[in-house]
Amino acid sequence: CCAHSAKNDVDDVGFIERVVNFTIEMHNVDSDRIYASGWSNGCAMAQRLAMESSHIFAAVGCMAMYLVNDPTEQYSPIPIMEVHGFLDQIVLYESTILSIPFNEDMWTEPEAYETGAVENMFEWAGHNDCSGGVKTFEMNALYSIQGFDECANNATVQLMTIFAAQHNPYSNDNDDGTLIGSSFIGTQGLVESSEIVWDFLILHNKSNLSVGSF
């Protein structure tokens, strides 16, 4: 989706679509309930799949990154949820400026400097033809979930903000045995963000997406 993959025109979307289609052919898969998720650049990839492969995916829920690719004419609104730590030290909550050196496709894109978690939510609300103001779906001492639920295709848009989380908004630390990985501490079990995202995803399937409904 991004970084060297985008610069070198690697067809990540085409590859993932082929993997999905092959899996459907070989296994008993409910093709109405195919979802995409990811963390950091993986979240950017998941949102690119939402934009470019909305005919395949029923919903997307991902962690700690924004849509960094241009919108496409073939996009049909699907539900989107992005989870972001307010204290994210890599992909800032207010902008992607610290991510730009690592994503060469963003170097000449001025709007890349402007995108933050809230802006990303509003951009998806525009893509999904949402109306009305921002709603608060959940608010407590640890996190909030806000967004839009009056959208085309019933394609709600949600932003989950974890107030004390950094770049790793998951419950557990990123213990991959490396110095960099060990610096990405999770919420220590205080916020089960994966479960919340999964609960969001399973509410949606292709059969429930009805164009023009709110």
PLM regions and their residue ranges:
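Hydrolases whose catalytic domains are alpha/beta-hydrolase-1, hotdog thioesterase
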Residues: 45-49
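A conserved short beta-strand
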Residues: 55-67, 78-79
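Short beta-strand immediately N-terminal to the catalytic nucleophile in serine-hydrolase-like folds
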Residues: 36-38, 63, 83
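Acidic catalytic loop of the alpha/beta-hydrolase fold
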Residues: 88-91, 167-169
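C-terminal catalytic histidine-bearing segment of alpha/beta-hydrolase fold enzymes
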Residues: 83, 112-116, 125-212
